[in-house]
Swiss-Prot record:
Tissue: High levels of isoform 1b, isoform 1c, isoform 3a and isoform 4 accumulate in early egg chambers and at stage 9 become concentrated at the posterior of the oocyte. Isoform 5a and isoform 5b are highly expressed in adult head and to a lesser extent in adult torso. Isoform 1a, isoform 2a and isoform 2b are found in all tissues examined, including ovaries, midgut, torso and head.
Keyword Transferase: no
Stretches with biased composition (Polar residues): 86-99
Annotated segments matching region Disordered: 17-52, 75-107
Top-rank taxon: Eukaryota
Name of this protein: Cytoplasmic dynein 1 intermediate chain
Length: 663
């Protein structure tokens, strides 16, 4: 019942609001009609002669004279005035009040009045000026088109005058008399809507109505932002001179040193660039003999990397190329016996792209670094295997040059020199494989170097440990690997499975094996079983994983052969270096008795390591004095032709047949 009573009260309240709204609207209409009639009556003070002429004209046309119309309007005005002066409550309001009290609405007694009004405006007077044909802003003295002489001018002024805002004023004032919309262009405020835009909208025109005439265009001052205001208010501060202690603190801060190192590298690269602006691409600047010599040069020296402090008297022990930045090569260096105060192990990163003579990064360790490699799946990490048996990790993003992580010296890890270090796997599953000279293979994760994930003892006949000196994985292989040892034998092994450990033993060299390289050309998987070994017995041997005997032995060297490496793009090309300072390039499709190209490094230093650039157009070698040489390989020798693979397959078959005949 309370709910029903509440609904009834709300309905009664809404009905009362509607009645009150109707009453106000009717009162406003009556008041407007009174004022309009009063103004029309007041405006009747026209010249009597004109009024008389007008009445005669209307009578001749059969229209009621103006005097009769004014008298009828005055009678209506008197009636409405009487009704308004009584100030008795409206019948609708009484009905609403009674409805709220008694619950019933009384019928309304309404009456209809027919009022006939006739208004004929006089002839309009048009006034033009010589300057403009638009209404002057803000005043009515210079109007181009004026209608103030009309009897309706007072009515229009009252129509557009400001009124007190109500919830229903928009509909009452602007929409209930659509017949008067044409008078908009004759109002005094037609230009005021464009005036004082900076102070808000002051136009009296209804919403949606556009003004007529040309607007007044003025210059607008540019906007002032808070920052400009703040700058104006700021007082110029005096520069305080730093003391020597404060300067030293800034210089020794980590951020300042990092900035100096990075900015110095950029400036050094810019200053080291030596571009020949007189290069003649037509070829008229060089003689024909010089061009012929350059085109026929199989090997030509490109760069020599050497640092007076860190490279001097240090033998290069290993090299590796970055997979993220192909122009970067890292080299590991042995200790310098003449400088006992310097770190024993040094690793330097060189840039082959820019003509700068200093390394990109220099890292050092307390023990001599015997092997190093880039982290394949992280461009900032560098790994190193030390003479003490530790695996160390450097990061070029940190300021310090010492390792950020290292493996422990314990029986669970390596305790002998680590000559073999390589990362295998994929982006989401990769491991670091290391082998020490005591025949222990360890698998590491970069996230945890505190202990190896897996270990394997490499033993021959379960009795004697194998001293491994070199290691290589065949193409697309992460489980099987081939190894060279100090006793001259070649071993194949597996990391996992039922046959984990040493699987096969191949015929031996007459001396320790110094280097091993597998055929990793990706275009022909038929050659994935091939690998090369070098030894101090002055020979290079070609092997197949399918046969325990060598396929061929290259015996052209007259000194220790220290390293060998297959070309990454050519199926039949490999490089080798020896202790006499000679670099040899062998193309098995051309000759197997003598090298295709050979060169002796200036000074004939003992060459220790050789490596190809990823493009196969350059070969990099390191010597015993700490110098790293980059040689350009002729394109006709480095780049294979279309039939190189088929030719190499044919020559390989011939080599196998000759090997079987010798047996």
């Amino acid at each position: 019942m309370d709910r029903k009573a509440e609904l009834e009260r709300k309905k009664a309240k809404l009905a009362a609001l509607r009645e009150e709204k109707d009453r106000r609207r009717r009162e406003k209409e009556i008041k407007d009609m009174e004022e309009a009639a009063g103004r029309i009556g007041g405006g009747a003070g026209i010249d009597k002669d004109q009024r008389k002429d007008l009445d005669e004209m209307l009578s001749s046309l059969g229209v009621a004279p103006v005097s009769e119309v004014l008298s009828s309007l005055s009678s209506v005005n008197s009636m409405t005035s009487d009704n308004s002066n009584t100030q008795t409550p409206d019948a609708s309001l009484q009905a609403t009040v009674n409805g709220q009290s008694g619950g019933k609405k009384q019928p309304l007694n309404l009456s209809v009045y027919n009022v006939q009004a006739t208004n004929i405006p006089p002839k309009e007077t048009l006034v033009y000026t010589k300057q403009t044909q638009t209404t002057s802003t803000g005043g009515g003295n210079g109007d181009v088109l004026s209608c103030h002489s009309s009897p309706l001018s007072g009515y229009m002024e009252d129509w557009w005058r400001p009124r007190k805002a109500h919830a229903t004023d928009y509909y009452d004032e602007y929409n209930l008399n659509p017949g008067l919309e044409w008078e908009d262009e004759f109002t005094d405020d037609e230009e005021s809507s464009l005036q004082n835009l900076g102070n808000g909208f002051t136009s009296k025109l209804p919403p949606g109505y556009l003004t007529h005439g040309l607007p007044t265009v003025k210059d607008v001052a540019p906007a002032i932002t808070p920052l400009e205001i703040k700058k104006e208010t700021e007082v110029k501060k005096e520069v305080n001179e730093l003391s020597e202690e404060q300067k030293q603190m800034i210089i020794l801060s980590e951020n300042f040193q990092r900035f100096v190192v990075r900015a110095g590298r950029v400036i050094e690269r810019a200053l080291s660039e030596n571009v020949d602006i007189y290069t003649d691409y037509i070829g008229g600047g060089d003689s024909e003999e010089a061009n012929d010599e350059r085109s026929h040069a199989r090997l030509s020296l490109n760069r020599v990397f050497y640092d007076e402090r860190w490279s001097k008297n240090r033998c290069i022990t290993s090299m590796d190329w970055s997979t993220h930045f192909p122009e970067l090569v890292v080299g590991s260096y042995h200790n310098n016996e003449e400088s006992p105060n310097e770190p024993d192990g040094v690793v330097m990163v060189w840039n082959t792209k820019f003509k700068k003579s200093t390394p990109e990064d220099v890292f050092h360790c307390q023990s001599a670094v015997m092997s190093t490699c880039f982290a394949k799946f992280n461009p900032n990490l560098i790994l190193g295997g030390t003479y003490s048996g530790q695996i160390v990790l450097w990061d070029n993003r940190v300021q310090k040059r010492t390792p950020i992580q290292r493996t422990p010296l314990s029986a669970a890890a390596h305790t002998h020199p680590v000559y073999c270090l390589q990362m295998v796997g994929t982006q989401n599953a990769h491991n670091v494989i290391s082998i020490s000279s005591d025949g222990k293979l360890c698998s590491w994760s970069l996230d945890m170097l505190s202990q190896p994930q897996d270990t394997l003892e490499l033993q021959q006949r379960q009795s004697k440990a194998i001293a491994i000196t070199s290691m290589a994985f065949p193409a697309n292989e992460i489980n099987s690997l081939v190894m060279g040892s100090e006793d001259g034998y070649v071993y194949s092994a597996s990391r996992h499975g039922l046959r984990s450990g040493v699987n096969e033993v191949y015929e031996r060299h007459l001396g320790p094996i110094t280097g091993i390289s597998t055929h990793y050309n990706q275009l022909s998987p038929d050659f994935g079983h091939l690998f090369l070994t070098s030894s101090i017995d002055w020979t290079i041997k070609l092997w197949s994983l399918k046969d325990t005997k060598p396929l061929y032995s290259f015996e052209d060297n007259s000194d220790y052969v220290m390293d060998v490496a297959w070309s990454p793009v050519h199926p039949a090309l490999f490089a080798a270096v020896d202790g006499s300072g000679r670099l040899d390039l062998w193309n098995l499709n051309q000759d197997t008795e003598v090298p295709t190209a050979s060169i002796v490094v200036a000074g004939a230093p003992a060459l220790n390591r050789v490596s190809w650039t990823p493009s196969g157009l350059h070969v990099c070698i390191g010597d015993e004095a700490g110098k790293l040489y980059v040689y350009d390989v002729a394109e006709n020798l480095a780049q294979p032709s279309r039939d190189e693979w088929s030719r190499f397959n044919t020559h390989l078959s011939e080599i196998k047949m000759n090997q079987s005949d010798e047996v």
